[in-house]
């Protein structure tokens, strides 16, 4: 069945800067915002934008992500024609061919794309937090008669060297692209969101794949090649909320952003819902002794202590006399009686011991509490007690 536009969602990244949060799961599967996973935002954007055919390309630690996505029913993508399809690397006659870059991942799934004979292909990343109407971007792409359109956002000049940076003319046509430049000429950063005319994308994926010196990456190889060959690349300016949650600190910041009174993400906006898999937990319980303010408290939580400006995921327990401030407590974790937690991300199923304290040594830092961190902390406490 022919589709005007289909999406290819890149979800195979490890996210090593998130440290132990991605030891056993892919970055797009990391919990976020009390009840979601990072990939929920991109999948929900597709649903809300009317993109009903999505290929999800997975590779690193994919099992939980595959189980979570299932047949796509949580995002209304369980369709007979189209819907969501998980696309891990697979074995061919020459052996298993791992994805070797973002462009190579799409190249290896040309047959999947061809069955829909699309006019346009939307390439997405599954590891950013944002809301976007992709239909508006597609309309812009068509109006500009572009070969490729790249969504861009203005970033602070001091951070521009961390991104792929676009230089454009007055018509927003891209005249120069630099990947993480030491001296950026612009602060228009690529968001890793592309719309290509499918015939042209197919042609250049094949050219790139045949180049043994290519890293097979859209930003490093394919886009510069299009510029060299004088194609029509345009930048699509995006002005909403967008966060690259690639570090522990940025993940914590994005969760805290949700608690701002006028935050741009607004999880309660019924006109642009963020869908997720229902955890099937009982209602949360807030005891008479508890004090909760400026926080997100999800299903299945039991709160008997004090919670201030924090995000509690499903099944979290906060004991009597415990205090939690500016923290993210992930699914199934517990803060025991009398414990104190501030500016921390507590990983799933971790248990903070009674009357212990968790807070960063540097006031601007964030503590990532894991089983290994707790073990080391307990050993240090035991040594101090012995002394």
Swiss-Prot record:
InterPro entries reported for this sequence: ADP-Glc_PPase, ADP_Glu_pyroP_CS, GlgC_bac, GlmU/GlgC-like_hexapep, NTP_transferase_dom, Nucleotide-diphossugar_trans, Trimer_LpxA-like_sf
HAMAP family: GlgC
Family: Belongs to the bacterial/plant glucose-1-phosphate adenylyltransferase family.
GO terms for MF: ATP binding; glucose-1-phosphate adenylyltransferase activity
Catalytic activity: alpha-D-glucose 1-phosphate + ATP + H(+) = ADP-alpha-D-glucose + diphosphate
Name of a matching Pfam family: NTP_transferase
EC identifiers of the protein: 2.7.7.27
Residues holding alpha-D-glucose 1-phosphate: 99, 164, 179-180, 190
Enzyme class: transferase
Keyword ATP-binding set for record: yes
Function: Involved in the biosynthesis of ADP-glucose, a building block required for the elongation reactions to produce glycogen. Catalyzes the reaction between ATP and alpha-D-glucose 1-phosphate (G1P) to produce pyrophosphate and ADP-Glc.
Key word ATP-binding present: yes
Key words, A-Z: ATP-binding, Carbohydrate metabolism, Glycogen biosynthesis, Glycogen metabolism, Nucleotide-binding, Nucleotidyltransferase, Transferase
NCBIfam families the record matches: glgC (TIGR02091), PRK05293.1 (NF003670)
Pathway: Glycan biosynthesis; glycogen biosynthesis
GO BP term, example: glycogen biosynthetic process
Assembly, per entry: Homotetramer.
Name listed for the protein in its UniProt record: Glucose-1-phosphate adenylyltransferase
């Amino acid at each position: 069945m022919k589709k005007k536009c289909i999406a290819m969602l890149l979800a195979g990244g490890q996210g090593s800067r998130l440290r132990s949060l991605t030891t056993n799961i892919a970055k797009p599967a990391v919990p976020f915002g009390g009840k979601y996973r990072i990939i929920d935002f991109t999948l929900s954007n597709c649903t809300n934008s009317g993109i009903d055919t999505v290929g999800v390309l997975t590779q690193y630690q994919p099992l939980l992500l595959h189980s979570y996505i299932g047949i796509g029913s949580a995002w209304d993508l369980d369709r007979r024609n189209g819907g969501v399809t998980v696309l891990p690397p697979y074995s061919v006659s020459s052996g298993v061919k791992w994805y070797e870059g973002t462009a190579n991942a799409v190249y290896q799934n040309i047959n999947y794309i061809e069955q829909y004979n699309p006019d346009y292909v939307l390439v997405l990343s599954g590891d950013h937090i944002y809301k976007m109407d992709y239909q508006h971007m597609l309309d812009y792409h068509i109006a500009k008669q572009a070969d490729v359109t790249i969504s861009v956002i203005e970033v602070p000049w001091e951070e521009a060297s961390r991104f792929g940076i676009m230089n454009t003319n007055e018509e927003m046509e891209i005249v120069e692209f630099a990947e993480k430049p030491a001296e950026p000429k612009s602060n228009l950063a690529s968001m890793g969101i592309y719309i290509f005319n499918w015939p042209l994308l197919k042609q250049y994926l094949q050219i790139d794949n045949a180049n043994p010196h290519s890293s097979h990456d859209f930003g490093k190889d394919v886009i510069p090649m299009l510029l060299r060959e004088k194609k029509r690349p345009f930048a699509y300016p995006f002005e909403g909320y967008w966060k690259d949650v690639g570090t522990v600190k940025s993940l914590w910041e994005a969760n805290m952003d949700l608690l701002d009174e006028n935050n741009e993400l607004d999880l309660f906006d019924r006109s642009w819902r963020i869908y997720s898999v229902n955890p099937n937990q009982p209602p949360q319980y807030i005891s008479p002794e508890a004090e909760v303010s400026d926080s997100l408290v999800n299903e299945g939580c039991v709160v008997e202590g004090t919670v201030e400006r924090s995000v509690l995921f499903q099944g979290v327990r906060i004991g009597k006399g415990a205090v939690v401030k500016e923290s993210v407590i992930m699914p199934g974790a517990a803060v025991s009686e009398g414990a104190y937690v501030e500016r921390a991300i507590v990983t799933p199923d971790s248990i903070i011991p009674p009357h212990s304290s968790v807070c960063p040594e540097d006031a601007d830092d964030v503590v990532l509490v894991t089983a290994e961190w707790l073990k080391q902390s307990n050993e240090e406490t035991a040594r101090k007690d012995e002394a």
